[in-house]
C-alpha cells in the first residue's frame, strides 16, 4: 500500500491538526529542490513530508548530527553503550549470534532473516504494518518505500537495494492510515531521524514502534550505483546484489544465479573515489544502526565458501522489542559459532591511507587480476576474521568519515557531529598526530609537499647532529649527500609501486 508522500502529507495534516499547527504550516521540499543538509543529505525522506518542520531536531547531518544516536541510546534501549566493551564498536546489545534461515527465503539477498521476521511480526499481529523498501517496477535495484500489510507485500521487498532510499517519506501516510503498531525497516541515518521524531508519531496515535535495521555503508545515488557496477562487473545489467565479503573480494550476484568475484585490490580506486559513495555515507558514524531494536547484517561472519543465499549473517538483539521480533522465527534459524581472530589495526591504517590518497587525487593503478587474487588469498588466511574483521571495517569507515567531516565541516560542526566513541577511535589511531595532519590536506600535491618537507626536516636534524659531533664534521656533507640520494630513490620507488 503506497501513495505519494506529498499527497499523504496534505491528507494527513487536517485530521491531526484541524486548528493548524506545524503539520499544516510545513512545506515539504519540492521535487528538484535543495534539502536542508545540502550535499550531505542522505535523502532519508523526512523532508519530503510535513516532517520537514522537524528537520532541525532530527537530521543526522545537521547540528549534533550523528551524535544524536549516542544521545538517544539510553531512551531507546534503557541504557547507553558500554564503551569499555565490544559495545564501543557494535552498540548496545544483549545478545548476538550468527545464523541462517532454514529453509532460506527464495529471492532474498541472503537467507531471508529480515523478510522472515517482518512476515512473522505482521501475521502474528505484533504489528499492523511494515515500512519496507520494494523495488521500482522499472529497475529492481531502485528503492521504492512502501507500507506493507500482507505477506505478499513484504515479499515484494526481498533483496538489497544499494542506494539512498527515502523511506521516511511514508510517515505522513502512516499517520493518515491511523496505524497504531508499526515495524520500520531501515538504515542508520533513517533510524536516527525516526527516533528523533518518534514522540510526534506517538502524539498522533502510534502506540508501538518496532525498528529492524541492517548494517549499512557506502551507499550512493542511483547514478553512483550504476557507475560502480559499470566499473566493476563484466555484465552490470544483470547484477541483482553485491557484498564486500571477508575473502577480500566483492561478490556480485547476477540474475542468472551466477556470482562474479572481484578482489578488492583490482578495483579502480581513482575512478570509484568520485561519484559513487554519497557525501552523507562518507560522513556517517552509524554503520551498525545503533538505535534499531534488532539488527541483521553480514560483516562479522567469515566467508564460508557458500553462496550468499546459503550464508549465515549476524544478528544483534538490542532490547526487549528486539526479542519480541526475533522470537517467532528463532526456531527456524540454524545458528553457527562466532569467530574472532587476527589483528585489525595494521589493515585499518593501510586501507585508510590507500583510500584517502586516492580521494586526494593520487593516481594508483589497480592490481592486475592474478596479483589481486594472490593478495586476497593470502589476506583471507592471515588477516582479521569474524568479529575482528567487523571491527576492522567499523574502524576504517569511522576514520574515513572523520577525515571527511574534519575537512568538510566547520570545526564546531565537526565537533558536534562526531560521536564520542568515534572520536575515541580517531584518537587511538592518531599516533603522533599523523591523522590530524591529514585533515589539513585537500589534495595529493599538498600531502606530497608535506612529506617532502618532513624528510627535509629530518635530514636537517641529522646534519645538525653530525655537525655538532666532535670529529665527524668533515663527514657531514658526504653523509648528507648519500642520505638525500637514498631518500630520493626510496620516495620514487614508493610512488612507483603505489
PLM features: residue spans?
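Short, conserved secondary-structure transition motifs
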Residues: 215-227
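A short alpha->loop->secondary-structure connector
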Residues: 199-213
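Terminal signal-anchor or tail-anchor transmembrane helices
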Residues: 473-498
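N-terminal mitochondrial targeting presequence
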Residues: 1-24
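Iron-sulfur cluster-binding cysteine motifs and their immediate structural context
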Residues: 19-77, 294
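Entry/capping segment at the start of metal-dependent catalytic domains
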Residues: 58-114
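Low-complexity, highly charged intrinsically disordered N-terminal segments
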Residues: 68, 108-141
Amino acid at each position: 500500500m503506497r501513495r505519494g508522500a506529498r499527497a499523504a502529507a496534505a491528507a494527513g495534516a487536517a485530521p491531526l491538526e484541524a486548528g493548524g499547527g506545524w503539520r499544516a504550516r510545513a512545506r515539504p521540499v519540492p521535487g528538484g529542490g535543495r534539502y536542508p543538509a545540502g550535499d550531505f543529505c542522505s535523502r532519508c525522506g523526512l523532508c519530503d513530508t510535513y516532517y520537514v518542520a522537524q528537520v532541525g531536531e532530527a537530521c543526522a547531518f545537521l547540528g549534533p548530527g550523528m551524535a544524536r544516536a549516542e544521545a538517544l541510546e539510553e531512551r531507546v534501549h534503557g541504557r547507553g553503550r558500554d564503551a569499555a566493551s565490544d559495545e564501543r564498536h557494535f552498540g548496545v546489545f544483549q545478545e548476538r549470534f550468527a545464523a541462517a534461515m532454514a529453509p532460506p527465503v527464495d529471492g532474498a539477498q541472503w537467507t531471508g532473516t529480515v523478510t522472515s521476521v517482518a512476515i512473522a511480526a505482521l501475521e502474528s499481529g505484533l504489528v499492523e504494518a511494515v515500512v519496507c523498501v520494494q523495488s521500482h517496477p522499472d529497475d529492481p535495484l531502485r528503492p521504492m518505500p512502501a507500507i506493507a500489510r500482507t505477506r505478499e507485500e513484504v515479499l515484494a521487498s526481498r533483496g538489497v537495494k544499494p542506494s539512498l532510499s527515502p523511506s521516511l517519506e511514508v510517515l505522513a501516510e502512516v499517520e493518515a492510515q491511523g496505524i497504531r503498531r508499526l515495524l520500520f525497516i531501515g538504515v542508520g541515518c533513517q533510524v536516527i531521524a525516526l527516533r528523533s521524531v518518534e514522540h510526534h508519531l506517538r502524539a498522533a496515535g502510534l502506540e508501538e514502534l518496532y525498528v529492524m535495521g541492517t548494517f549499512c555503508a557506502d551507499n550512493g545515488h542511483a547514478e553512483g550505483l550504476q557507475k560502480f557496477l559499470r566499473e566493476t562487473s563484466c555484465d552490470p545489467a544483470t547484477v541483482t546484489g553485491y557484498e564486500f565479503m571477508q575473502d577480500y573480494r566483492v561478490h556480485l550476484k547476477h540474475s542468472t544465479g551466477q556470482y562474479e568475484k572481484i578482489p578488492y585490490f583490482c578495483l579502480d580506486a581513482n575512478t570509484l573515489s568520485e561519484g559513487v559513495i554519497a557525501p552523507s555515507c562518507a560522513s556517517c558514524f552509524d554503520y551498525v544502526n545503533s538505535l534499531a531494536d534488532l539488527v541483521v547484517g553480514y560483516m562479522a561472519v567469515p566467508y564460508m565458501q557458500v553462496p550468499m543465499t546459503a550464508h549465515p549473517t549476524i544478528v544483534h538483539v538490542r532490547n526487549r522489542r528486539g526479542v519480541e521480533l526475533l522470537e517467532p522465527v528463532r526456531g527456524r534459524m540454524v545458528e553457527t559459532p562466532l569467530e574472532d581472530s587476527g589483528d585489525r589495526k595494521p589493515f585499518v591504517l593501510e586501507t585508510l591511507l590507500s583510500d584517502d590518497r586516492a580521494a586526494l587525487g593520487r593516481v594508483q593503478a589497480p592490481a592486475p587480476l592474478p596479483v589481486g587474487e594472490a593478495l586476497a588469498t593470502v589476506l583471507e588466511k592471515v588477516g582479521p576474521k569474524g568479529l575482528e574483521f567487523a571491527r576492522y571495517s567499523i574502524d576504517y569507515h569511522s576514520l574515513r568519515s572523520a577525515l571527511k567531516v574534519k575537512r568538510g565541516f566547520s570545526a564546531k560542526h565537526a565537533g558536534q557531529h562526531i560521536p564520542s566513541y568515534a572520536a575515541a577511535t580517531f584518537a587511538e589511531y592518531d599516533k603522533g598526530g599523523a591523522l590530524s595532519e591529514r585533515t589539513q590536506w585537500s589534495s595529493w600535491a599538498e600531502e606530497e609537499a608535506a612529506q617532502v618537507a618532513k624528510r627535509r626536516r629530518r635530514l636537517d636534524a641529522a646534519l645538525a647532529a653530525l655537525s655538532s659531533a666532535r670529529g665527524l664534521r668533515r663527514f657531514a656533507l658526504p653523509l648528507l649527500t648519500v642520505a638525500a640520494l637514498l631518500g630520493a630513490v626510496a620516495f620514487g620507488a614508493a610512488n612507483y609501486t603505489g
